[in-house]
Amino acid sequence: MNIVFLGPPGAGKGTYAKELKEILGIPHISTGDMFREEISAKSELGRKVEDILKRGELVPDDLTNVIVKERLSKPDCKKGFILDGYPRTVAQAKALDEILKKLGRELKFAIYFEVSEDVVVKRISNRRICKNCGKIYNLITLPPKINGKCDVCGGELYQREDDREEVVRRRYKVYMDNTYPVIEYYRKSNKLFTVDGSMDVDSVIKEVLNIIRR
C-alpha cells in the first residue's frame, strides 16, 4: 500500500499521516525527516544536504531522489508507506515511478487534500508556539487557557515569521504554481483521489480509509 499525500502548507498532511500510520501499520516518511536522519548519521549525503540547507537553498532533485530511494529500500517499507512532502515537481513524480519500478512496486494512491487559500491562512496565521517548551497552539482550534501564555510551562507564545498572513499567502501561491502540476500528473494516471481537507480530522481520516479500502 504505497501512498503519496499532496496538498498545500496547512492542509494537515503531517497530522493525517501520523494517525494513519498507526491504523495502517506502515511508516510515515517526510522529506524533512529523511534529511534530518541523513544529517544525524553524518553520511556523505547528509553532509551535502546540511551544507545546502545552511545556505538556505532547496535540496536539488537528484540528491532528494537518492535519499528517497535509500529510504524506500528499507525493510519497514516493504508493506507500504505514506510519503509526505515528495514529490513536489513532475520530475520528482517521474523519478518516484522509476524508483518504485526498480523496487518491484508501484504507487497505488496519490491523495490530494484540497484546502482553499483562506482556510490555509486561517490555520497557519493563528498558530502560536511556546518559546520555552515548543508546544503548538492555534488561537481558533486549540487556544491557550490564558492569552499569550503556555498551559504547560507558562512560557510566552510567539508567531513564527513564516506563519504571518502575507508569507502564508505567498507560500500557497508558490505551491499552486510549482506543485499543482503534480496533481494533474497523477490525475492523468488515474491514481489521484481528492479529499476535502477543510473537514475535521476524524472526517478526513474516515474518507482516506474509505478510499484505500474500496
Swiss-Prot record:
Region of interest (NMP), residue spans: 30-59
EC number: 2.7.4.3
Cellular compartments annotated: Cytoplasm
Record GO biological process: AMP salvage
Record family assignment: Belongs to the adenylate kinase family.
Binding-site positions, Zn(2+): 130, 133, 150, 153
Taxonomy of the source species: Bacteria, Thermotogati, Thermotogota, Thermotogae, Thermotogales
Residue ranges of the region described as LID: 126-163
Annotated coiled-coil segments of the chain: none
Swiss-Prot/TrEMBL domain comment: Consists of three domains, a large central CORE domain and two small peripheral domains, NMPbind and LID, which undergo movements during catalysis. The LID domain closes over the site of phosphoryl transfer upon ATP binding. Assembling and dissambling the active center during each catalytic cycle provides an effective means to prevent ATP hydrolysis. Some bacteria have evolved a zinc-coordinating structure that stabilizes the LID domain.
Oligomer status and interactors: Monomer.
Main location: cytoplasm
One Pfam family, short name: ADK_lid
Binding sites annotated in the UniProt record for AMP: 31, 36, 57-59, 85-88, 92, 160, 171
Enzyme class: transferase
Single GO MF annotation: ATP binding
Keywords: ATP-binding, Cytoplasm, Kinase, Metal-binding, Nucleotide biosynthesis, Nucleotide-binding, Transferase, Zinc
Annotated protein name in UniProt: Adenylate kinase
Highest taxon of the lineage: Bacteria
Binding site for ATP: 10-15, 127, 136-137, 199
Catalytic reaction annotation: AMP + ATP = 2 ADP
A single GO cellular-component term on record: cytoplasm
Function in brief: Catalyzes the reversible transfer of the terminal phosphate group between ATP and AMP. Plays an important role in cellular energy homeostasis and in adenine nucleotide metabolism.
Pathway(s): Purine metabolism; AMP biosynthesis via salvage pathway; AMP from ADP: step 1/1
CDD domains: ADK (cd01428)
Encoding gene, per UniProt annotation: adk
